[in-house]
Amino acid sequence: MVGMKVQHDGRLYSLDDERIVVYGGTLQYFRVPRNYWEDRLRKMKSHGLNTVETYIAWNWHEPQEGVFDFTGETHPQRDLIGFLELAQKLGLYVIIRPGPYICGEWKNGGIPDWLINSHPEILAKSPNGSFPRDVYYPPITYLHPTYLEYAMKWYEEVLPIIRDYLYSNGGSIISVTIDDEPSYWETIFQPFLTDYNEIIVRENGIWHSWLKENYSLGDLEERYGERFSDYTEIAPPKSFSEPLPKVLDWHHFKIWMINEYVRRLYEKIREYVDVPISLLDPYLLLAAWKEFYLYVTRHKLDIHLWTEFWYSFYRTFDFKEDKLGHLYFKTGIYRYYVSKLKTPPLSIETQASLANVIEKDEAELLYALLPALGIHNLNYYLYVGGENPRGYESHNGVTWDVYSPIGLDGRERQHVEPIKWIGEFLKSNIDFVDSQFKARVAFGMYEPYEALNLWGYKPESFEESVNLNEYLFGERGLLTLLAMSNVPFDVIDLEISTLEEMLQYEQIWVYSLDFMSREVQEKLIKYVEEGGNLVILPTLPYLDENMKPCTRLRDFLGVEVERAKARDNMRLIPYLSVDAEGIDRMVVRNVAREVKGGEAIAWIGDKVVGTIVRKGKGSAVILGFRLQYYSSYHDMHRKFVDKILQLQGVKREVEVSNRDIIAIPRIHYLVLVNPRDEEVAGKVKYRGVEFEIKMKGRGVLFIPVDVEINGVKLVYATATPIGGGNRRIKFRNHLSDTSEIAIRDGRIRGVKGGYVLQEKGERVYVIRHERETFEIEF
């Protein structure tokens, strides 16, 4: 096996030219009793998994400085080598995550106590000095030379072991992951919490060096509104009393330090490793992935960007229709960047635990929607429950089994069921990966808005609310409305997207705050001029990135939006009724601004609050209110989305008579989703094919359309194909007891697990099946 390679085509990984779907689960060997390892790994294989993922905890394997145990001499659960050999014996691939930091609800995130105690200077600092030593993840100054020195020593011990078990050396390790979610131990979410370590803030320290590298003094005077004779006069901001551009620069500076840190680790790992090197969610932000993409591209780092999906934490798992907007957004922005990096998309932490209970239908909704939206490689976290060794616990005391698919005692929990069948579908229908998701509509993200939303900071002079969680990303947000209106969308970064990339979309939605860079405003102008259809709400920007007046977009559109302050206290906001043609009293929240100019399309009484402007070859819809998701009998909000599509001539790729059936087109497959736990039925038209569908409860079907499977040319099937053999197809339909199969030639010779109930037409068969799975021989 020596010399075998792990390669990829940007969608899937290939092991010696054989494309595979990475379908794995997390078993942290150091938390599971040694004598359970084989049983748990065999159970994982029986669930259809082909990969096991694990951290390697630095402080577990080096409990005292210079004293290492990788063979279990001091504790059987330190036998890393034995674990790797067992996984290989059982035919499982391995993804390994050796830190230095692993997070993982583990003591110090894996950083040894002895290192912190002997070198407290490596700890990050607040503006007021040191943090309490007992915080669960003591934040480290990533670029402190002492920390880097010890991190490299750790790597020099663990990486030779990893090298021996690489797939390319005859082992089973197919990827090595750098650190874990390098986000300053999640304090990046609070702009002034870290890092004021001396090596950063001292005169001519890292902060001043970064400013010199990125700005002239003249640029900084323009941005900060002050005069400077030297960079050393510019102290890091410590509160929101500083100019917003300076606070944003401090935020981006810390992101840059993370990137620098990741580069140092990457270069060390690459000395030992020739398989893909990966990184999970840099910064734990989304739009800020722009900074990661630009950095690794500039430095020519071959790092595979991976992501994660969590929808509860130590509470009952809750993934229903109102989470679809956020899911569409996160998968969209992730697809955008991995397509630019040209590496396979992979969710390394797909939530399968850390919840009081996970209902199998809600688990199915999340697990099936990820591949439907372009993430075909999945790892379920945490797949196998365990216990924390004494002295290494963090959040959980002794327990590390919080409703994992396989419990500490070996029991298999209910959400194993969707994990099994989704894996069967993905592995038996590799061509699904090549039937790519491509939307006609995009949401345009402007990265600086993410930080303001994250911090909850609205400059006093701003008029629009920065609460994007409520109005955009959240359960009632605009993006959930688009998802539930059957408007599948991509996400693009407005700062780095080219005009050509933007024009691939018939329509782009933009949520605007008070400011937007002059360059982005110019791009949106060009997009409309060249035939694009813009929807922008709930205001138009009137400031540029330096918070200086800039009304280029407003001037081009010839539209004035009323200057009215949104209210931030949710108890003090008004509820208003908007009318439009065919729309009677659609409720909107917070202030609604008058829009002057263009053709009126929405109003409150005599006040116009929405218009359409036709410019050049395209158009723009300007709304002075926040369009959100409300589900009701009258369903005004989804009807208003329909109206906007119609006004701008944007047609859906799929027609569904029942709008509660969500359709995601994938060329030769159509993913149908019932996000609600009630029966839905309707007619579907797609690619010249029309059929009826019934879904008795919450769940997902992968419908093949005009595709050949196992030598059978299907016109369509209202069930999910999950395997079979030559001219045999195994199907699964758990949402109805009848399924419709249409074929181009031949006939059905037999049905195992069901029977032909009716022949509706030439080669169109209705199958009644007693069980959820049935197999047809053609």
Swiss-Prot record:
CDD domains from the UniProt entry: A4_beta-galactosidase_middle_domain
Residues binding substrate, per UniProt: Y55, G104, E105, D180, E181, E308, E349, Y381
Documented EC number(s): 3.2.1.-
Domain of life, source organism: Archaea
Thermal characteristics: Optimum temperature is 90 degrees Celsius.
Subcellular localization(s) per the UniProt record: Cytoplasm
Signal peptide: none
GO terms assigned for molecular function: 2-acetamido-4-O-(2-amino-2-deoxy-beta-D-glucopyranosyl)-2-deoxy-D-glucose exo-beta-D-glucosaminidase activity; beta-galactosidase activity
InterPro entries found in the cross-reference section: Class_I_gatase-like (IPR029062), GLMA (IPR053516), GLMA-like_C (IPR054747), GLMA-like_second (IPR054746), Glyco_hydro_42_N (IPR013529), Glycoside_Hdrlase_35 (IPR001944), Glycoside_hydrolase_SF (IPR017853)
Comment on pH dependence: Optimum pH is 6.
Pathway the protein contributes to: Glycan degradation; chitin degradation
Catalytic residues of the enzyme: E181, E349
Effect in UniProt of substituting E181Q: Retains 10% of wild-type activity
Record key words, sorted: Cytoplasm, Glycosidase, Hydrolase
Function: Exo-type enzyme that specifically cleaves the non-reducing terminal glycosidic bond of chitooligosaccharides. Catalyzes the hydrolysis of GlcN-GlcNAc to glucosamine (GlcN) and N-acetylglucosamine (GlcNAc). Involved in chitin degradation. Can also hydrolyze chitosan and chitooligosaccharides of various chain lengths.
Name of the featured protein: Exo-beta-D-glucosaminidase
Origin species: Pyrococcus horikoshii (strain ATCC 700860 / DSM 12428 / JCM 9974 / NBRC 100139 / OT-3)
Gene assigned in the entry: glmA
